């Protein structure tokens, strides 16, 4: 049985798209599915093995510390395919690919355009710089992935 591991550091454990549409569909198709996600316990729900991540303690925690937890917990599944859902996991996706794994990046939103509206990033020139750096890194990172799934054509 082929093992697939979905990874999210930002979405709720029973997200409609990730858990209900993608993970459960894979289970029904005969795959061994794990989901590394913020959750309170190890359990199997509708055939999906839930691998818990600790609750987020702010943006920096989620983007730096939680991504490390997610990467190492995902590795422990020893899956053949890794499907991640959050841009802060792009480096983990590159590392997984370097390790010979199949990697899918599921881009749910247009992050570079959202950066323009995130006041916590700084003033407008700083946001423009961050946006352009993100775009460059994203273009570099997707060269490593086997597949990129997007919800709209502009992504």
Residue ranges: model-predicted function:
Residues 6-65, 154-155:
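N-terminal strand-loop element at the rim of the active site
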Residues 68-75, 95-99, 105, 111, ...:
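Membrane-proximal helix-turn-helix segments that form the acceptor-binding/catalytic region
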Residues 88, 153-154:
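Alpha-helix/helix-capping structural signal
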């Amino acid at each position: 049985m082929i093992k697939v591991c979905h990874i999210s550091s930002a979405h709720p454990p029973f997200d409609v798209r990730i858990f209900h549409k993608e993970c459960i569909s894979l289970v029904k198709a005969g795959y061994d599915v794990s989901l590394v996600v913020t959750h309170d316990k190890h359990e199997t729900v509708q055939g999906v093995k839930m691998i818990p991540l600790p609750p987020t303690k702010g943006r920096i925690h989620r983007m730096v510390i939680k991504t490390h937890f997610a990467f190492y917990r995902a590795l422990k599944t020893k899956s053949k395919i890794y499907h991640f859902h959050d841009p802060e996991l792009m480096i983990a996706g590159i590392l997984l690919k370097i390790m010979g794994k199949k990697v899918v990046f599921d881009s749910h939103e247009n992050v570079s355009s959202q950066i323009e509206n995130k006041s916590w990033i700084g003033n407008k020139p700083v946001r423009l710089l961050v946006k352009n750096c993100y775009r460059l890194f994203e273009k570099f990172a997707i060269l490593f992935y086997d597949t990129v799934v997007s919800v709209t054509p502009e992504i």
